[in-house]
Design a protein with these regions (language model features):
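Phosphate/dinucleotide-binding and metal-coordinating scaffold of catalytic cores
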Residues: 1-353
Length: 353
């Protein structure tokens, strides 16, 4: 895999300047207030980063509309650069995504979770934080997160032309003009180890589940959630690509069992069950948890990272005029996150023993 695109480097806090016409801004605000799940595209007057100015991008709302009401003044955006010209890119990217989940009060959850996943060898999107300015005024601090799309696949996979599906409703996200989705049907229909092994990169899936279990994550493939993609790599079969890591760390108690725990109202995790119910699969899963702890979840390293990143974003977080929580909540969330990773690492260590 190639390294992260420059705009997601950990040692920068980029500022993106958006010029949005009054008409478009009022449409976006109405859509946000009404929880409009259609998320239509609107023309963006201009997108500026340092010396780069783009005037033919489009803007739309992003995130899950059912949570928007929790954050009345702080919309979340996707900016698309290739809607009007299919070849257009910004620093090699088709889109940028600005995420601000209501309960990510440290601003660091996705960023830390995805970094851990990349460190242990999971193909996971890149993320840092970014300041967003709207019509000349500071609008807020966001998680700046890489979109899982064809550009992402090109970065990670030797053969990036396979089918990508989003778990939510198994919607096809690449090669959409080809209506054949029999490959994912075969994956969904697999009901024993041999059938699954024929279509899925099981070792990769085990690593992905183990990483989510250690974090822990309450909404991905491991917990019986819907926040992940599957990519049918022509070389290895279906790989699991994690997504949306704001329901991680302090969203869950530090002592959830890395094997048994499952989210309330889960959506099932048939692939996980098939694999971990075989003695060999379970053995590999435990080894993967050990690997994640050793290569990605060293508490002092994570705490140093939290300290470094929180120093980087501190001024931007505190001066964010639209965040739906207080500076005190932000500071508390950082302290809780620091304490949590230590407790979690100790708990998983004991569980392995």
């Amino acid at each position: 895999a190639k390294g992260c695109p420059d705009i997601y480097k950990q040692d920068i806090l980029p500022t993106f300047e958006l010029e949005i016409s009054p008409t478009v801004l009022s449409k976006l605000e109405k859509e946000w207030a009404s929880g409009d799940g259609d998320k239509p595209d609107h023309p963006l007057a201009s997108f500026k980063y340092e010396d780069t100015v783009i005037t033919d991008a489009v803007i739309q709302l992003r995130g899950n509309p059912k949570w928007w009401f929790q954050s009345p003044d702080k919309m979340q955006f996707e900016i698309k650069f290739n809607e009007n010209d299919k070849q257009a890119r910004f620093m090699g990217l088709k889109s940028v995504l600005f995420d601000a989940a209501r309960y990510n009060e440290s601003f660091l959850r996705d960023r830390l979770a995805l970094k851990i996943m990349r460190d242990v060898g999971v193909p996971a999107p890149c993320a840092n934080n970014a300041r967003v300015v709207v019509n000349g005024e500071y609008y807020g601090l966001f998680v700046n997160i890489e979109k899982v799309d064809s550009e992402f696949l090109e970065r990670y996979f030797e053969f990036p032309d396979g089918n990508l599906y989003k778990r939510d409703d198994w919607e096809k996200k690449t090669n959409e003009e080809d209506k054949d989705d029999s490959d994912v049907e075969e994956l969904i229909d697999a009901d024993n180890y041999a059938e699954l092994d024929a279509v899925m990169n099981i070792d990769q899936a085990i690593l992905e589940w183990a990483a989510e279990a250690v974090l822990p994550d309450n909404d991905g493939a491991w917990a019986g959630g819907l926040n992940y993609y599957v990519y049918n790599d022509p070389l290895t079969g279906f790989n699991i690509i994690p997504w949306d890591k704001d329901a991680t760390f302090t969203r869950i108690p530090h002592d959830v069992d890395p094997y048994k725990d499952i989210k309330p109202n889960d959506h099932g995790r048939p692939f996980y069950d098939i694999v971990t119910k075989t003695p060999a699969g379970y053995q590999k899963y435990v080894q993967a948890i050990e690997h994640v702890l050793k290569t990605g979840y060293d508490a002092p390293t994570l705490q140093a990272r939290i300290d470094e990143w929180s120093a980087q974003i501190d001024e931007a977080a505190k001066s964010d005029p639209n965040k739906p929580f207080s500076d005190g909540d932000y500071s508390d969330a950082l302290k809780e996150l620091r304490t949590f990773v230590k407790k979690r690492a100790e708990f998983v260590e004991d569980w392995l023993d």
